[in-house]
Amino acid sequence: MAAVIADSGFLVALGIRRDPRHAAAKSFLAAYKGEIVVPSPVVVESCFFFSTAAKISLLDWLRKGPARVAELPPQAYAEIGAILGRYASLDPDFADAAIVWLADKLGCRGILTVDTRDFGVYRLKGGKRFEIVRWFG
């Protein structure tokens, strides 16, 4: 797998030492050789769970790599809105819809998430499923 998209569950596990998946996130990161893409809304969503020090650490980690932050152009909002509408019964958040949009644009199906229920339902263009990367348990 050349690239994966990271959801907030992965970043939270990585950034909070007491998270039960912290060691698994660190181990995955140490072994993974591909690119990790983080949509900018996922950065915002992740910071909600962090202390100020953890927010600063996350931003420093993102600045240094190996992850790349993907910004969303305003032109994407109509498509993201359509994705939100398509999955309204799941009550998706903006970050999830942004991940679906970005995955379509990048042709990237791999995702680092703890939200296997929703990402098992979301579909990319052409009906393709996400490939949920096993990074914990």
Please provide the spans of the model-predicted regions:
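Conserved short hydrophobic patches within well-ordered secondary structure
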Residues: 94-99, 111
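Conserved glycosyltransferase catalytic-site signature
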Residues: 8, 40, 96-97
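Generic enzyme active-site microenvironment
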Residues: 5, 113
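PIN-domain endoribonuclease scaffold, especially VapC-family toxins
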Residues: 2-4, 15, 23-91, 101, ...
